[in-house]
């Protein structure tokens, strides 16, 4: 089963997350099928904090992928940002 979830990167005390489509059986930071965007919780000033390829997210959901709660929240946030 394919899931859309966050994969942690960055360094200690400076997290950075990739939003990825991955097989449910693979570990959190392991291999993934496709990178769908990123989330930087420590974005400051003019830095981009969130980017999501909504067309690819819709494709993966269309073929049965399920998003984690946090990924779903970020996707909704990106959708509202795009609509505004």
Swiss-Prot record:
GO terms of molecular function: structural constituent of ribosome
UniProtKB keywords: Ribonucleoprotein, Ribosomal protein
Highest rank taxon of the organism: Bacteria
Biological process per Gene Ontology, one example term: translation
Family matches, as Pfam families: Ribosomal_S16 (PF00886)
GO cellular component: cytoplasm; small ribosomal subunit
Family under the similarity heading: Belongs to the bacterial ribosomal protein bS16 family.
UniProt-recorded name of the protein: Small ribosomal subunit protein bS16
Organism: Delftia acidovorans (strain DSM 14801 / SPH-1)
